[in-house]
């Protein structure tokens, strides 16, 4: 299992020794040994690897990883280059185009966002191939709740983008009045037309960041 190497490491060190995590680790060892699990074991913590704690400006919460071959690589909503853009991400790009005029790219690889301080965090970090929510309730929620609590403790103002009921359930962890929450329905084709389209999260995020003296995000994902 990959161990954290940046400033998240001391902050999350004690989580790795808690009974829930030790149990989760044993479960995952067996799952990776006997089944096809996504993402690759070495990509599980990529959201934390790509976005150090000190650099977090925006959080986009997802649910669990994509469960198709070659899609998930540890960042919520993101897929590896060369993989078709999933429907929810296609709707995110459509809203980004309508909001800021960004062209719709030929890939869904969101590492550029992560490297600018956008924490792309799923609340569950692993999944069985072809079985959505198969690792729900196994312990990841305790771990990712702690990540959200740590971001909540930051002095620097952070924008939380909470799309859909699952993400909005985490609002109770965001108690620091410095931070800014933007809520909308999930970008899934089942709900995007009910208020995701037109809520302009990207321009609103940048307006807030600029208001508090932080660099805005360059949201354009380039063609590969």
Swiss-Prot record:
The keyword DNA damage applies. InterPro entries: UDG_fam1, Ura-DNA_Glyclase_AS, Uracil-DNA_glycosylase-like, Uracil-DNA_glycosylase-like_sf. GO terms for cellular component: cytoplasm. It holds the Pfam family UDG. CDD domains: UDG-F1-like. One of its GO terms (biological process) is base-excision repair, AP site formation via deaminated base removal. It is found in: Cytoplasm. The active site is at 64 (proton acceptor). It catalyses: Hydrolyzes single-stranded DNA or mismatched double-stranded DNA and polynucleotides, releasing free uracil. Its EC number is 3.2.2.27. Belongs to the uracil-DNA glycosylase (UDG) superfamily. UNG family. This is Uracil-DNA glycosylase. It comes from Geobacillus sp. (strain WCH70). The gene is ung.
């Amino acid at each position: 299992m990959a161990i954290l190497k940046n400033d998240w490491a001391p902050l999350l060190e004690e989580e790795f020794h808690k009974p829930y995590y030790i149990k989760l680790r044993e479960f995952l060892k067996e799952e990776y040994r006997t089944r096809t699990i996504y993402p690759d074991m070495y990509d599980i913590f990529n959201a934390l690897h790509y976005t150090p704690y000190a650099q977090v400006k925006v959080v986009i919460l997802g649910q669990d990883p994509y469960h198709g071959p070659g899609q998930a690589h540890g960042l919520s909503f993101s897929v590896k280059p060369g993989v078709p853009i999933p429907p929810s991400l296609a709707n995110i790009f459509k809203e980004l185009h309508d909001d800021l005029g960004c062209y719709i790219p030929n890939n869904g690889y969101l590492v550029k966002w992560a490297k600018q301080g956008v924490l792309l965090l799923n609340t569950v970090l692993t999944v069985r191939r072809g079985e959505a929510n198969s690792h729900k309730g196994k312990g990841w929620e305790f771990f990712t709740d702690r990540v959200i609590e740590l971001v909540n403790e930051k002095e620097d103002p952070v924008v939380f983008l909470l799309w859909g009921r699952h993400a909005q359930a985490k609002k109770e962890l965001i108690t620091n009045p410095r931070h800014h929450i933007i809520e909308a329905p999930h970008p899934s084709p089942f709900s995007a037309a009910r208020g995701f389209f037109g809520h302009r999260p990207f321009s609103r995020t940048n307006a807030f960041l600029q208001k508090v003296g932080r660099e805005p995000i360059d949201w354009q994902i380039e063609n590969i």
